[in-house]
Amino acid sequence: MRKHYVILIALYTLSVSAVERVSLEQLQADWSRYTNQMVQVSTPLVVCGSFYDSLLLAPERLYCPEERAVGLADGDSTEYWRIVESNRANSIVIHCRNSYYKVRTGDRVRGFQARVTGERHFVTGAGVKTSHTRVAKLERKEKGAVRVVGANVENLFADLGGYATRRTTPKQNALKLSKVAKGLKAMKGDLYALCEVQVGDKAPMMLLEALNKGGKKYAYVSMPVENMDRIGGCFIYRVDRVRPYEAPLSAYADTSSHYYARMFAQGFACVDKKGAPTGERFVVSLNHLKSKRPGRGNYDTHLKRLSNVDSLLAMLPKAVALYGDSDVLLLGDYNCYTQELPIQAIVRAGYPDQLMRFCPNDYSYIFKGEMGYLDRCFASPSMEAQVVHVQPWHVNADWYYQHGAYRLKDKSLHRYADHEPIVVDIKLR
């Protein structure tokens, strides 16, 4: 019996010693040497993406190349390709047994054991231990400031079925509404500029009913359109803080245009608790530009976004004249990263990027493990002097979910949409 114990101990020692401890740098130097071997990866890594049974890991978070460099659609650059190659070379994919809904991008991984199955790929029959220390902190609003929130709420529809990303069951639709309402309430906004809301009255009224349960009194403004089975935008405002004046102004004269209800401006007047005007006014332009297609380049959709920006820039002087105020905020989902030409065109037209002013290294969206800003906040020169704080609030993009469906047990506000909201505090004077 003792002899058997000795043999078992020897075999166990051999199996343990067969698992080589290596750094990511050692693996990168010669992947072929470690292929089909069990290894213990010692390099601290961060979760950049979560895809069903796979995690994308890297030494640090990965930026979308167009967030930091001129991309393919704008003429290409050496820096763009350097980032593309760096993101690929410094990231690995591990197939594991983690519960996808428990892993967030930004989680830390401090070593794991797995089999190398090829360059940058690992497989393990166990889970990968992750830790999360970040807090989605939202700065408190400065006394006397007006809080304006720009948010893509990802296809908020009152009706079921039909639209490609609409929730298909009453329970899913109710959970979606509950999450959006919780998220908006938590931000304590005085004015919300919302993208991807079903046009017409149904969806805004549905959201107002949920918001007004808390004792606040909200109302809404949207562009009147005939086709009610599509997405647009709307403003939701606290009636004891701001009130709209004059009619909304679209960047598109054609009411049948897909962008008529997606790109428009509205003037707002500040009021006291009794609803009396305080004399301060400002203008908010809500914009949702043409979406990207998967893959690099996107030249055809890029041209459409440039056209969207041309229409926007032509509309803004009209908005200033209509509302009689040059204090203008531009919010919404621009579907462009920071270094892309549509964004730079807006900046060059005299509307500085407030995210680059307050938090240039942050993000509002994650796609295939790469992060960047698709959601924006620009300000006219007179408004920029009155912007006191801007931040993305990280309650959505880091959380995984299956497209079009939530876990019904998840009653939190997290992942109410796929984009982070942009929170803006202004002190008008």
Task: Identify the function of each model-found stretch.
Residues 20-36, 96-99, 104-108, 116, ...:
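Metal-dependent phosphoester-hydrolase catalytic domains
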Residues 145-160, 246-248, 281-291:
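Active-site-proximal beta-strand elements of phosphoester/diester hydrolases
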Residues 9-18:
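Hydrophobic h-region of N-terminal signal peptides that target proteins for export
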Residues 2-8:
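Sec-dependent signal peptide recognition
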Residues 202-289:
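Structured beta-strand-rich core segments of catalytic domains in phosphoester-bond hydrolases
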Residues 18-145, 150-162, 176-178:
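Extended non-catalytic accessory segments flanking core domains
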Residues 33, 58-59, 65-66, 120-232, ...:
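N-terminal, active-site-proximal structural segment of metallo-dependent hydrolase catalytic domains
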Residues 55-62, 173, 192, 264-273, ...:
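Extracytoplasmic, non-cytosolic globular domains
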